[in-house]
Amino acid sequence: MARKTPLNRYRNIGICAHVDAGKTTTTERILFYTGVSHKIGEVHDGAATMDWMEQEQERGITITSAATTTFWQGMDQQYDQHRINIIDTPGHVDFTIEVERSLRVLDGAVVVFCGSSGVEPQSETVWRQANKYEVPRIVFVNKMDRAGADFDSVCNQIRKRLGASVVPIQYNIGAEDNFKGVVDLIRMKAIFWNEEDMGMTYEEKDIPDDIKDRCDELREQMTEAAAEGSEELMEKYLEEGDLSNDEIKAGLRQQVLANEIVLGLCGSAFKNKGVQALLDAVIEFLPAPDEVKAIQGVLPDGETVEARKSSDDEPFSALAFKIATDPFVGSLTFIRVYSGVLNSGDSVLNSVREKKERVGRLLQMHANSREEIKEVLAGDIAACVGMKDVTTGDTLCDLKNPIVLERMEFPEPVISVAVEPKSKADQEKMGLALGRLAQEDPSFRVKTDEETGQTIISGMGELHLDILVDRMRREFKVEANIGAPQVAYRETFTRGADVDGKFVKQSGGRGQYGHVKVKFEPIDRDEEFQFEEQIHGGSVPKEYFGAVQKGIDEQLQAGVLAGYPILGVKATLYDGSYHEVDSNENAFRMAGALAVKNAAKEAGAVLLEPIMKVEAVTPEDYMGDVMGDLNRRRGIVQGMEDTMAGKIIRAEVPLSEMFGYATDLRSMSQGRASYSMEFLKYAEAPKNIADEVISGKKS
């Protein structure tokens, strides 16, 4: 089937922002103006179309990134029809994994900021992730009708705190209650949207006198930024002192695609002002799939790197970036197609797991409705029904042309809780539900505690686990009791050790005999366990090296102080002895494990605790209380800053001290302070804390 929309008219974009910047409302308005949804869903009423999980509507935050396809021809129908695939991303820090996944498969992003609170801590996280994946972006300063809204100030904050070169291509006419519309700095026209028909129509007028000078100044800066797009433009600009509107657009587009600049737009999604102009900017300045770098993958030999161009003629390759459980069709695998064509009914290879998968139905998703399609082409984002063994981050590709597209990296969980089913009936359902949730979300882990038999779930924060337990109840009808949160401590060796590990059982008949000499040394904690052997003269036969390594590795995972995995260790097997008859793999595995236990004292084993990077935003009146409280929690304040949103306090605080912080912070600031927290590093726990944890584990 021929393409309905040529590839150069595709835009795969994400809309990302801080929690309350108005991202879902902005997306809603986009759906409204592109004609997809007839009644605008308001987040305030818990009715937004993109937020389709019950919980999101209750909490008013977006948790799962729903993918939506819309079409747009411009405010004046001035373009050919473009197809815009939008991924709505969550802004809460416990869900950064979702944002990371989405950014991985996008070609461009719209970053929404609140006109009155500006750059908030979460915005920095999202910005860093977008930098990591080199995503070209434009900025939409929303809520210009709010008290304290100031477009210039937000642009300055983005320059200062995010280090981005912001070039405004619009300017606001009035602000707060007097916010009337925006000036298009390229055409130098003032645009006023009609409030009677929810902004569907608008009129253009001359720029109001009171902001004319400021607009001239900004246009000059914008033209200069556009001139840097190419040498020809720069020459013309230097000769004539100006560029045509088309040249300005071409120059700005070059600069945005090269990630040299970020364009600044403004409006109020809630008041229906500025969203259509934002859509025009998406078409005008964000890249089509064939304008971004071709995706690179590794061939089956594990070494050869190959690029796959965004074209229907290349072999099929796609990345599964999200797994979702849908109440009607079961498991949905969202894929971004990078190259080639896929028809429903085709078989593909999951090259990460080396398994063949058959594609059942293919669905084009709107936020909570779906249309069945027969094929997907390069550049498309769609959902497949009925995939068995696909996890987030897997590559799906042509059976004859296997390739592994780059893996996404997922952080290790930092917090765990025990969950117990309330009844026997819940027991079986719980296993199934947890398996499903873990498949959807790679930052969520499930394991069984071998000593207690309890099921332990781990995730990125309290809210993350709350929501997963809540989903278990709603979607899978599993009732469970939740234990107190547990911190994911780790252990490490602080110095080298040279030890024996000897496992001998000889009491007549076939015995067990394994003896090793191992040197342990600390390495960087972020590195994987390293194992070397330097056996000379066959004191330990070659066939037992693997068993020794396995024994050491297993004991490192099990820990020596309090049962937590040991990080940053290199082990060198350099000597030992064996018995012709009694030695076997098991004996050498046990000997390896004993070597780790014996090394604990000599190697100075210590307990490590996770340290979180905490950013609290508070009105000045409560600053003393918030600081004092962070100090009591063993926090080390790293710095403070004044912003539009209030004072920002940056601190490093042990995770174990942060439980219940959200509630405490609310009560000490009468609900006006907020915070974000993400994992920073592991650091040695103070002796009194370590002793408590170790004795707690052993009691």
UniProtKB/Swiss-Prot annotation:
Its main location: cytoplasm. GO terms for cellular component: cytoplasm. Disulfide bonds: none annotated. It is found in: Cytoplasm. Keywords: Cytoplasm, Elongation factor, GTP-binding, Nucleotide-binding, Protein biosynthesis. GTP binds at residues 17-24, 88-92, 142-145. Coiled coil: none annotated. One of its GO terms (biological process) is ribosome disassembly. It comes from the Bacteria. Residues 8-290 form the tr-type G domain. Pfam families: EFG_C, EFG_III, EFG_IV, GTP_EFTU, GTP_EFTU_D2. Signal peptide: none annotated. One of its GO terms (molecular function) is translation elongation factor activity. Catalyzes the GTP-dependent ribosomal translocation step during translation elongation. During this step, the ribosome changes from the pre-translocational (PRE) to the post-translocational (POST) state as the newly formed A-site-bound peptidyl-tRNA and P-site-bound deacylated tRNA move to the P and E sites, respectively. Catalyzes the coordinated movement of the two tRNA molecules, the mRNA and conformational changes in the ribosome. Belongs to the TRAFAC class translation factor GTPase superfamily. Classic translation factor GTPase family. EF-G/EF-2 subfamily. HAMAP family: EF_G_EF_2_B. This is Elongation factor G. It comes from Alcanivorax borkumensis (strain ATCC 700651 / DSM 11573 / NCIMB 13689 / SK2). The lineage of its organism: Bacteria, Pseudomonadati, Pseudomonadota, Gammaproteobacteria, Oceanospirillales.
